[in-house]
Structure formats: C-alpha cells, structure tokens
Amino acid sequence: MTLLDGKSLSVTIERDLTEQIAALVSQGVTPGLAVILVGNNPASCAYVQMKAKACKRVGIYSVTHEMPSKITQDELLSVIEILNNDPNIDGILVQLPLPAHIQTSKVLEAINPKKDVDGFHPFNIGRLSVNVDTFVPATPLGVMKLLESYHIDVRGKDVVIIGMSNIVGKPLMSLMLNAGASVSCCHILTRDVKQYTKNADIVCVAVGKVGLLSADMIKEGAVVVDVGINRLESGTLVGDVDFENVAPKSSFITPVPGGVGPMTIVSLLQNTYKAAMYRLEQRMRV
C-alpha cells in the first residue's frame, strides 16, 4: 500500500508556481484573488484563512470581503459586479455554503466566467463536460493531479465516484470520462453501493460520512481516494473511508488529512495564476 501524499506534492507545486508568478510579476501583472465570505461559519472562516495564507506564500495578492450573514442577494451581486470590473482582480471566489435566503446558483452565475477560478459557473462546467480548456473545480483537479503524479493511469479503468455534488462528484466524473475512464456515480438513491465498488479499479468518496467505505466494499489492490473531511467529537479529522481497514487492502490510498485537501488549495492557486495569464495575454493584444 502506498500513501497518495498530497501534502508533499502541493509543496512541490507551490515552489514551481512561486517562480512562475514571480516571472509574471516582472511583466507587470500580479495575480489577484478576491474571496467573498458571507457570515461567520467557523469552517468557512478557517478555509478562507488557509486560502489567504497560501496566496501569500506564492505571491498572489488576495483580499477577503467579509459580509454579514443578513446581506441581501442584490447587495452580494453588486459586490460581485464591482469585482468583475476590477482590473487588478483575476479570480473571484465565493465561499460556500451561503445563507439560505441567498440563491447560490444566481450568485455563481454572476461571476465573470473568466474570473471563475472555482470553476462553478455553468459556462465553465459546460466547457469541462465537452473537454475544452477551462477553469476546473479545485478539488477534482487536485485529485487528478495527485493520481497523475503517482503514475496512476485512469484510461480504461473502472472508476466509481460516491457522491454527486456540483463541487466534487459531477466535475470529477467529467474529468475521469475525459481521461478515458469508465465511470459510475453512486449517490443517496443508489440502492447497493457495494455492487458498484467491489469490482472498481479506483474508488473516490466525497460524501461527508465517517466510515462510509469499508474494506469489504473494495477489491484487493484498488486505488482509494478519500475526499471527505469530518471532525470527530475528539477534534480528530477523518475522511469518509474506514482507513485502518481499507488501507491494507488497497494499492494506493489518500490519507486524511494530508491527501486531497492540500491539493485543493494548490489547484485554486494554479487557477488564479491561469486567470492572471489570461489578463497578460489580453494586455499584449492591445
């Protein structure tokens, strides 16, 4: 069994990205990321702080717009419009989830697709589905980079994804299909998840339920990717996989923490750099 070490890989990618950003800055373009945080959800606040620190490490200018939880949808859309028109902001990220009175789809659709570094705009989702270059959601992108770094070729492989969220499951399914995998997606209405996972070459779990994937659900030598992040009452972070029992049976497996999480952050940084490169290209055409 080999651990898919996202933490060490993310450090390597950050080092390379820092050099690329420095070269970009020397041409007069400093990548800029605007993060919108609505309310004071502890998990959301922690994620935003992690993103800000990561931006600082690689040389990306980042600014966080903290909004009260009672902000109206129209007020939030106005903030996004200002950022859409700010020439110093290359990427716009709205931290999810949003309060119940705000329609998430409307907010995400308001972001300029060329600044949608989260890859959640329908325009970018559509481009991903037809395998055209676009912004790819950070977590699925991080999963693919992690597999690639360990020379795990998904072409012709049977892949099962448990979870069909717009953030992870669906875009990951598109990426896997684009890479030549045969993909099945299990969700809350799937009657027998084990029936799908027991013969899969690669199993990706992104649900948010402790111990969802047990050892009897995978075949010997399967690759297991755990996207779940759950905090136990003791404060310990665990994923969706029964790691202790699944790991000995797998050929590769991601730990939690230290697997997919760091790759999500670094993929966001790469998307922001990509958006800044677009700005430079536009400037050079003038």
Curated annotation (Swiss-Prot):
InterPro entries: Aminoacid_DH-like_N_sf, NAD(P)-bd_dom_sf, THF_DH/CycHdrlase, THF_DH/CycHdrlase_cat_dom, THF_DH/CycHdrlase_CS, THF_DH/CycHdrlase_NAD-bd_dom. Its EC number is 1.5.1.5, 3.5.4.9. One of its GO terms (molecular function) is methenyltetrahydrofolate cyclohydrolase activity. PROSITE patterns: THF_DHG_CYH_1, THF_DHG_CYH_2. One of its GO terms (cellular component) is cytosol. Pfam families: THF_DHG_CYH, THF_DHG_CYH_C. It catalyses: (6R)-5,10-methylene-5,6,7,8-tetrahydrofolate + NADP(+) = (6R)-5,10-methenyltetrahydrofolate + NADPH; (6R)-5,10-methenyltetrahydrofolate + H2O = (6R)-10-formyltetrahydrofolate + H(+). GO terms for biological process: L-histidine biosynthetic process; methionine biosynthetic process; purine nucleotide biosynthetic process; tetrahydrofolate interconversion. Disulfide bonds: none annotated. NADP(+) binds at residues 163-165, 188, 229. Keywords: Amino-acid biosynthesis, Histidine biosynthesis, Hydrolase, Methionine biosynthesis, Multifunctional enzyme, NADP, One-carbon metabolism, Oxidoreductase, Purine biosynthesis. Pathway: One-carbon metabolism; tetrahydrofolate interconversion. HAMAP family: THF_DHG_CYH (MF_01576). Homodimer. Belongs to the tetrahydrofolate dehydrogenase/cyclohydrolase family. Catalyzes the oxidation of 5,10-methylenetetrahydrofolate to 5,10-methenyltetrahydrofolate and then the hydrolysis of 5,10-methenyltetrahydrofolate to 10-formyltetrahydrofolate. This is Bifunctional protein FolD.
